[in-house]
């Protein structure tokens, strides 16, 4: 496989094996073709909500297909996912969003933040959004993780490498 950006990996595999299973998790599976279409529509929904290239997007979802869909949709916009535990108490989640200043929080109830747009777990993009491939975009950073805050306030660890 030639080197692919994170925003193109799904497109690459969907073009070669659209009907093969991409993710199988707890009895639910999606194919590469479905994964491609769903992440394209989700990326367009996130864009409509204000996500732009090089933004941080906090993802507070449990492990599973929806988590991967959110991360790849963010990468397709040339933005940077900032995954956090879906089980974090609100006070810790607020500290992390204050630190990262994301343009969107995925996995928090709508209106959970005064100044940040959020969408709940189970968010489904509108059917009007295209499932066609998006232009290739690559963020300056691959991911933004947070430290545990064991020496005080959590810190943001931004990485350009997997």
Placement of each model-derived feature along the sequence:
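Flexible, low-complexity linker/hinge segments
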Residues: 1-4, 111, 119-142, 154-158
